[in-house]
Design a protein with these regions (language model features):
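Acidic, glycine-rich segments characteristic of secretory precursors and extracytoplasmic regions
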Residues: 1-29
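Secretory-pathway/luminal and periplasmic proteins that interact with or process carbohydrate-rich
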Residues: 17-23, 38-39, 106-118
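Acidic helix-start/capping segments at beta-turn-to-alpha-helix junctions
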Residues: 29-35, 95, 101-102, 132
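Short alpha-helical hairpin
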Residues: 32-56, 131
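Conserved, well-structured interaction surfaces
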Residues: 45-114, 142, 146, 164-170
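Inward-facing hydrophobic residues that define packing positions of alpha-helical scaffold repeats
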Residues: 72-75, 152, 159
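Short coil/linker segments at helix-helix boundaries
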Residues: 113-153, 157
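Glycine-rich, acidic and aromatic/proline-enriched surface loops and short helix-turn segments
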Residues: 157-164
Length: 171
């Protein structure tokens, strides 16, 4: 139903922030951990490019990965419902657009955190992340990692298509 599509879209956004881990991976971190009131093992491991061994940290890498792919799964479930069950009902175009944009956003966050930064000279060979466009139908499927360039092309395609479908009538 359209209501269930909207409910799925409510969860199509990552329920975790990546700002902390991104900040620690930048050159903005202080040299002395005592100056950082949020200093902990994750902070030190990330700032000094050491393996991250603290597994129970809410903002840890595994949770960031999981929450973003859960959001992608919700966006894909909404898209699948619109395309199959609701037969591409035109009144749901704004919801379809939102799902495409939400999927692009989550992939954008992941490729920025888990892949090399986009470089036009190397992006066609740098490993990206799996770009998931369909709901999962099997447990733990093997996913192919495209290149960074391919991931950005898919992000751009989702954004371009999604933005043409979004309007204020749905909201």
């Amino acid at each position: 139903s359209p209501e269930k599509v909207q409910q799925a879209l409510t969860n199509a956004y990552p329920q975790i922030a990546t700002t902390l881990i991104n900040e620690f991976s930048s050159d903005n971190i202080d040299d002395i951990g005592a100056d950082n009131i949020y200093s902990n093992f994750l902070t030190r491991e990330t700032a000094y490019w050491q393996p991250i061994l603290e597994y129970n940290n809410v903002d840890g890498l595994q949770n960031i990965w999981d929450y973003h792919y859960k959001a992608i799964g919700q966006a894909n479930a909404a898209l699948d419902a619109i395309e199959t069950t609701l037969h591409n009902d035109a009144s749901l175009n704004p919801a379809k657009g939102e799902a495409l944009v939400a999927r692009a956003y989550a992939h954008f966050c992941l490729v920025n955190l888990f892949s090399q930064a986009y470089n036009p000279n190397t992006s066609s060979s740098d490993l990206g992340i799996p770009y998931i466009t369909r709901p999962e139908e099997e447990m733990n499927p093997q996913r192919q990692r495209g290149t960074v360039a391919e991931v950005y092309q898919q992000i751009a395609a989702d954004l371009e298509k999604g933005l043409t479908l979004i309007d204020d009538s749905y909201y």
